[in-house]
Amino acid sequence: MTLTGCDRTSDSARTLKLAHGLDTTHPVHKAMEFMAEKVKEKSLGRLRIDIYPSEQLGNEKECIEALQLGYLAMTKTSASPMEGFVPKIRIFGIPYLFRDAEHFWKV
């Protein structure tokens, strides 16, 4: 993930929206909460991440569109919804493309 638009000269706090479709008990959501805490801590409170789980701001496709329009700063999606935006990603949806996990990570 890339964070852009973080002006160090501003005294006011900035808030970034992060939306995803996972439940709040999911480990990835827990990691996002940890990241949000660290960002707030390391930025001395000047940068905050508000997390919207469980498709509160839309499904994966809608969140990608919101990113493009600038309504969201970050999202987490699976590869499948990305195929409509980045056609080259379709290669990863081919069944049996990889022999096993080791082959996947080598590629």
Regions found by a protein language model. Name each.
Residues 1-15:
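Short, low-complexity disordered leader/linker segments with a strong preference
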Residues 15-22, 102-106:
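N-terminal-biased segments
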Residues 17-19, 50, 75:
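Short, well-ordered beta-strand segments
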Residues 17-33, 54-58:
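Extracytoplasmic "Venus flytrap"
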Residues 25-50:
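Short, polar/charged alpha-helical segment
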Residues 36-37, 68, 78-107:
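Contiguous mixed-secondary-structure segments that line small-molecule binding/active-site clefts
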Residues 44-47, 63-77:
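Alpha-to-beta junction loops
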Residues 46-60:
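Early extracytoplasmic/lumenal segment of secretory-pathway proteins
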